Each structure stands twice: as structure tokens, then as C-alpha cells.
Amino acid sequence: MPSIIDVWDHVQQMRQPWAPKEIARVNDQVIRLALFDGEFPMHKHSNADELFYVLKGQITIRVKGQPDIVLTEGKMAVIPRNVEHSPKSVKPSYILMFEPLALNPRGD
């Protein structure tokens, strides 16, 4: 049976920053919703790319050795595997992350 997911309902339940919550699975991929508030430490993922989609708010992704990436609502970016990055937000922002199920959102 097809799944209907109310993303905004999940947003209203989010309280803790930097604690991604799985909201859907598609094959071997997972969609996680996260509240970004402040800055997450620099990290990387050795085995997989990571996609950030800004649902609400704005984030900046610091990328080691490259210009910062600024994402506003409706924008997304793919961070390739092995690229050190650090997402941050000045105000609470809600992000959808599309990634392999086995990926540790906190990095290697």
C-alpha cells in the first residue's frame, strides 16, 4: 500500500537540533528530517554522497577547501563522498536529507 507522509506534521514534532529522524525509506535510501540550529562539526562520509534539501529556513554548508554553499528554502545540494563539510544555520531550519540507509548522519 502506498505511504502518505505529512512532512509538516513531522516538522511540528521536531524539538532537538542535530537529531535526524527517519521519515521514509525508498529502496536502499532513507529520507531523514533534521532540525539544524547552530553549527555541526566538520565531518565526511567515506562511502556515500549526501543530499541536503532546505524545507524551511536557510543553511550554510562549509566545505573544506571550497567556497561555502548557501541554501535557502526549496534549494538543495549534493555533498560528494569523502568531502569534509560542516552545515550550520543562524536560525532553526528544517532539512530533508536523502542518503543511503547505512549512512551514519554524524559522519565517519
Predicted regions and their residues:
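A short, N-terminal "cap"/entry segment at the start of jelly-roll beta-barrel domains
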Residues: M1-R32
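A cytosolic small-molecule/anion-sensing beta-strand core signal
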Residues: N27, L55-K56, T72-E73, K91, ...
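Structural motif
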Residues: V30, E39, Q58-T60, E84, ...
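Conserved short histidine dyad/triad with adjacent acidic residue
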Residues: V30-S46
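Beta-strand residues in well-ordered beta-sheet regions across diverse protein folds
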Residues: A34, V54-L55, R62, K88, ...
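Glycine- and acidic-residue-biased ligand/ion/polar-headgroup-sensing regions
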Residues: G38, N47-D49, Y53-T60, K64-G65
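Short acidic-glycine-tyrosine-enriched beta hairpin
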Residues: G65-R81
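Ligand-binding loop in jelly-roll beta-barrel domains
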Residues: R81-D108
